[in-house]
Amino acid sequence: MRHGKVHRKLNRTAEHRKAMFANMCAALIKHEQIVTTLPKAKELRPIVEKLVTLGKKGGLDKRRQAISEMRDLDQVRKLFGVLAPRYKDRNGGYTRIIKAGFRYGDNAPMAVIEFVDRDEDAKGKDSGPTQESEAA
């Protein structure tokens, strides 16, 4: 019986799910908008909302909790330095999910998950490694 089982398995092991959502959290914080499948977006939303709430609370212990959840120091800095002040007056509801049709190939339902009041210039900026960062 599935009583009390609230999360989707997404056909992955627990370690794979944890790593996938850590990467997706970092990507969403970096670009402030990502396209993924609808079930993944629905599972990602509460994780990101809790991270933004950690950022709003501030403090070293909350920063360490965010680092252990996300494992990307640059995005944790952005979370605490940019996103937390942006949403300081908002009580939850930091993200929205917009259905985006179906994927060609397997007809999977797609969705766009983005931050409410997001920075339009953040999308696509600094995607992937650059030669300056590899040389340094």
From Swiss-Prot:
GO annotation, cellular component aspect: cytosolic large ribosomal subunit
Gene3D superfamilies linked to this entry: Ribosomal protein L17
Pfam family, one: Ribosomal_L17
Domain of life: Bacteria
InterPro entries: Ribosomal_bL17 (IPR000456), Ribosomal_bL17_CS (IPR047859), Ribosomal_bL17_sf (IPR036373)
One GO MF term: structural constituent of ribosome
Record keywords, A-Z: Ribonucleoprotein, Ribosomal protein
GO biological process terms held by the UniProt record: translation
PANTHER family noted in UniProt: LARGE RIBOSOMAL SUBUNIT PROTEIN BL17M, RIBOSOMAL PROTEIN L17
Family as reported in the entry's similarity comment: Belongs to the bacterial ribosomal protein bL17 family.
UniProt subunit comment: Part of the 50S ribosomal subunit. Contacts protein L32.
Protein's name in the database: Large ribosomal subunit protein bL17
Gene: rplQ
